From Swiss-Prot:
<protein>
    <recommendedName>
        <fullName>Hemin-binding periplasmic protein HmuT</fullName>
    </recommendedName>
</protein>
<dbReference type="Pfam" id="PF01497">
    <property type="entry name" value="Peripla_BP_2"/>
</dbReference>
<keyword id="KW-0732">Signal</keyword>
<dbReference type="InterPro" id="IPR050902">
    <property type="entry name" value="ABC_Transporter_SBP"/>
</dbReference>
<keyword id="KW-0813">Transport</keyword>
<keyword id="KW-0574">Periplasm</keyword>
<keyword id="KW-0408">Iron</keyword>
<dbReference type="InterPro" id="IPR002491">
    <property type="entry name" value="ABC_transptr_periplasmic_BD"/>
</dbReference>
<feature type="signal peptide">
    <location>
        <begin position="1"/>
        <end position="25"/>
    </location>
</feature>
<dbReference type="GO" id="GO:0042597">
    <property type="term" value="C:periplasmic space"/>
</dbReference>
<comment type="function">
    <text>Part of the binding-protein-dependent transport system for hemin.</text>
</comment>
<dbReference type="GO" id="GO:0006826">
    <property type="term" value="P:iron ion transport"/>
</dbReference>
<keyword id="KW-0406">Ion transport</keyword>
<feature type="domain" description="Fe/B12 periplasmic-binding">
    <location>
        <begin position="28"/>
        <end position="279"/>
    </location>
</feature>
<keyword id="KW-0410">Iron transport</keyword>
Amino acid sequence: MRLRLLSLPFILSLCAPLLPLNTLAAERIVTIGGDVTEIAYALGAGDEIVARDSTSQQPQAAQKLPDVGYMRTLNAEGILAMKPTMLLVSELAQPSLVLTQIASSGVNVVTVPGQTTPESVAMKINAVATALHQTEKGQKLIEDYQQRLAAVNKTPLPVKVLFVMSHGGLTPMAAGQNTAADAMIRAAGGSNAMQGFSRYRPLSQEGVIASAPDLLLITTDGVKALGSSENIWKLPGMALTPAGKHKRLLVVDDMALLGFGLETPQVLAQLREKMEQMQ
């Protein structure tokens, strides 16, 4: 009987189905959305992430990666230049045509839910964990998140909170209903000082005074845009409100407040503590 020598590549090809996926080929992942990036890192995919969008500032390791731009003005060429095998992208990302172009190039485009409620974060974790084949880690992360969220007291308090959004060169805006800020204020047990409109409106002296906020909420980037925290009280009508008279101000991280990611329970606890101190 004649024996044939099998080549090493042939032997390895037979064994390939038995090897773990990550042994065969590592993914090259681009993450779009601060919440998505944060979750992907928490699930241990940091070594496979090759680029991220400008809203992805956490963890700090993400800041060292190439930035493919703002999630609502994506460019296909910039993303494809990173040679990704997978795009983990928030469903809030735009334009959708770019995502279609990327998918048609052979990239696995995974859309992550973008709902703006604290409870929706579990859905985001599940979507990312499934894409990364880390469902067990994902379940543990969901359980940890839900425990931290449940620890925040959500009993209603008689505190009216005004959230001001400020970006360099733009008129400061007040958050109305159907905004991420409104959802966070209500989730912490407060009430939105601005009523009667959805989304955002420019601040007006009459509107601010009439809303009579007890507490002013703003992000760290908002303070930078205004120059300093003291400049907040120079905004139209602000000094004449209960918040202005008592200098009641809470400054929080932008993505932690508005991104609905892993840090949501932490910023809710900050807001809740500040409101309880006012009682």
